[in-house]
């Protein structure tokens, strides 16, 4: 990961779960992983980037063009949901984007198989820098609790606009996640797999 990070961020051997920073307090691994996604366009020339959670296990063939593209528009995972963590992430995104905190109410863009457009990532970073008056990285890592997916989603939906940014809202989740499913017994596990929908291609 160091290859795509700015030189003022480096591993801190003495701190297992944090990275050292010359410009900010220590940065958690989780925030660094998010920064790397936003930095990916520096190292990759593709127009579309697909982020797949490392815990995903594919159970069916996955054709990105068939599942993520519709009339040249790219799927943007979006469901309406209200949780305390989502409210916090939405408010942090609003701060970084210069948006009213209450706009984008109930939006959730977080998933385990997410696709972004390169040009939107670049535009998002530039917008954050204009709003924050500092580098987008420094503005981003100033927050311990933040979601890159919510930040990108709110930017796309509320600034250029979903269609103008080359996206369409997709309420289907391609990955059947275990976050909210008990997995303590064989019965729990069997129930988890029974709930997989025909359109889902992976489990997590």
Question: Where are these predicted regions, by residue range?
Answer:
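GT-A fold catalytic core of metal-dependent nucleotide-sugar glycosyltransferases
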Residues: 33-76
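Conserved glycosyltransferase catalytic-site signature
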Residues: 30-35, 55, 145-150
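Extended C-terminal regions of large enzymes
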Residues: 193-204
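Conserved catalytic core of nucleotide-sugar-dependent glycosyltransferases
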Residues: 59-139
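Catalytic core and acceptor-binding pocket of nucleotide-sugar-dependent glycosyltransferases
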Residues: 102-191
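Active-site-proximal specificity loops/subdomain of glycosyltransferases
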Residues: 1-42
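Short, solvent-exposed loop/turn segments at secondary-structure junctions
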Residues: 55-59, 63-65, 82-83, 157-159, ...
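A general structural signal for short secondary-structure junctions and capping/turn motifs
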Residues: 39-43, 50, 142-144, 192-195
């Amino acid at each position: 990961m160091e290859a795509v990070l700015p030189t003022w961020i480096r591993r801190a051997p003495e701190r297992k779960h944090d990275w050292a920073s010359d410009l900010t307090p220590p940065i958690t691994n989780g925030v660094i992983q998010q920064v790397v996604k936003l930095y990916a366009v520096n190292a990759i020339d593709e127009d579309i980037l697909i982020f797949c959670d490392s815990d995903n296990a594919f159970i069916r063939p996955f054709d990105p063009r068939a599942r993520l593209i519709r009339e040249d528009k790219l799927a943007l995972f979006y469901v309406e949901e209200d949780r305390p963590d989502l409210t916090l992430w939405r408010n942090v995104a609003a701060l970084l984007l210069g948006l009213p905190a209450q706009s984008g109410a109930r939006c959730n863009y977080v998933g385990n198989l997410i696709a972004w457009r390169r040009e939107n990532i670049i535009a998002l970073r530039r917008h954050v820098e204009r709003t924050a008056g500092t580098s987008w990285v420094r503005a981003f890592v100033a927050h311990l609790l933040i979601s890159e997916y919510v930040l990108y989603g709110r930017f796309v939906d509320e600034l250029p606009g979903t269609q103008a940014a080359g996206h369409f809202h997709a309420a289907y989740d391609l990955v059947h996640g275990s976050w909210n499913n008990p997995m303590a017994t064989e019965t729990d596990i069997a129930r988890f797999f029974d709930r997989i929908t025909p359109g889902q291609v992976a489990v997590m």
